[in-house]
Regions:
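Glycine-rich phosphate/adenosyl-contacting loop at the front of the ribokinase-like
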Residues: 1-64, 78, 236-237
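Conserved phosphate-binding/catalytic region of the ribokinase-like
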Residues: 1-4, 186, 190-294
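Structural alpha-helical scaffold elements that stabilize or flank donor/cofactor-binding regions
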Residues: 109-110, 164-165, 202
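Conserved beta-alpha-beta core of the PfkB/ribokinase-like small-molecule kinase fold
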Residues: 116, 120-195
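Conserved N-terminal subdomain of the carbohydrate kinase-like
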Residues: 39-121, 142, 291-294
Length: 294
């Protein structure tokens, strides 16, 4: 049976100064992974409203499979403001559809046929979605890549949620600011960046830890290996979705059998390109996608 790369969690609309654009880390991730020839699916929940209809329509138009049951809450929206460098701050609405993702038979079937799943901390702010994410992860095959793209937002996370997620994942994706927050949360703020990463990798027996540091480059740590890549200098339109495109490209490359350093190099190039485009889900040029398509 065909196996899927799954983005699991929040489906929402980023309300930017120039208008609303479909976003949410899981859909962004799944969309970018799908551009490399992998079957991908976004799993979330939508409201029984016009925005829910528009979400399904837009994902269909992008050719992205989605499992998003309709629930009795509004489809998620996020107010996004960009600073002079295109870096976003978020006003995330609460009590929305993706806070109530049900573990339906179709969602469970996606877990059983999953080659990689990416999830974050934001959708775990509510009990129902947190339980669905845990059940999904526990139902995946043994060889599934379980990527915790931590995505700390505001105060929508707890130490317990982070620890449980680290126990369930085998790859952690984190940025430098989040690493500082986690160091503070877990009581090892004195260590330098690299030692914090090695400590987390060993403590939670992770296969890989991916650290992005904005314009200061990015790292991949694995047992016996450290990869570093400079961040290319580009004309930034906005950075919304850039991290998700990095994770999507990296995951697709690893599943295609690429070595870690090669997967890392591709992810950096893809992420830099997405920064030059408006919105989180631009179409990627073939010079990127052709590198790992069969």
């Amino acid at each position: 049976m065909e196996r899927y790369i799954v983005g699991l969690g929040e489906a929402l609309w980023d309300v930017l100064p120039e208008g609303a654009k479909l976003g949410g880390a899981p859909a962004n991730f799944a969309y970018h992974a799908s551009q490399f020839g992998h079957s991908a699916v976004a799993v979330s929940a939508l409201g029984k409203d016009d925005l829910g209809d528009q979400t399904a329509k837009e994902l269909d138009e992008k050719g992205l499979k989605h499992i998003m049951p309709r629930v009795d809450y509004p489809t998620g929206t996020v107010g996004v403001e960009l600073d002079a460098d295109g870096v976003p701050t978020y006003d995330i609405r609460t009590g929305v559809a993706w806070d109530y993702i049900p573990f339906t038979p179709e969602v469970e079937a996606a877990a059983h046929n999953c080659s990689a799943v990416c999830f974050g901390s934001l959708a775990q702010r509510s009990e129902q979605s947190r339980e669905t994410i845990a059940k999904f992860l526990d139902a995946t095959p043994d060889d599934c890549l379980k990527i915790f793209d931590i995505n700390l937002r505001g105060n929508f996370y707890t130490k317990e949620v982070i620890q449980e997620s680290l126990k369930r994942c085998n790859i952690l994706k984190i940025n430098d600011e989040e690493l500082v927050a986690i160091g503070r949360l877990f009581g090892y703020p004195g260590l330098d960046i690299e030692n914090k990463c090695w400590l987390i990798l060993g403590k939670y027996n992770l296969d890989m830890l991916v650290l992005t540091c904005g314009t200061n480059g990015s790292y991949v740590f694995a047992k016996g290996l450290k990869s570093f890549q400079e961040t290319p200098k580009v004309e930034v339109a906005d950075t919304v979705g850039a991290g998700d495109s990095f994770t999507g490209a990296f995951t697709a490359a690893i599943l295609s059998g690429k070595p870690i350093r090669e997967a890392h190099e591709l992810a950096v190039k893809v992420s830099a390109y997405v920064c030059t485009q408006k919105g989180a889900m631009p179409r990627l040029p073939e010079k990127f996608t052709a590198q790992i398509k069969d």
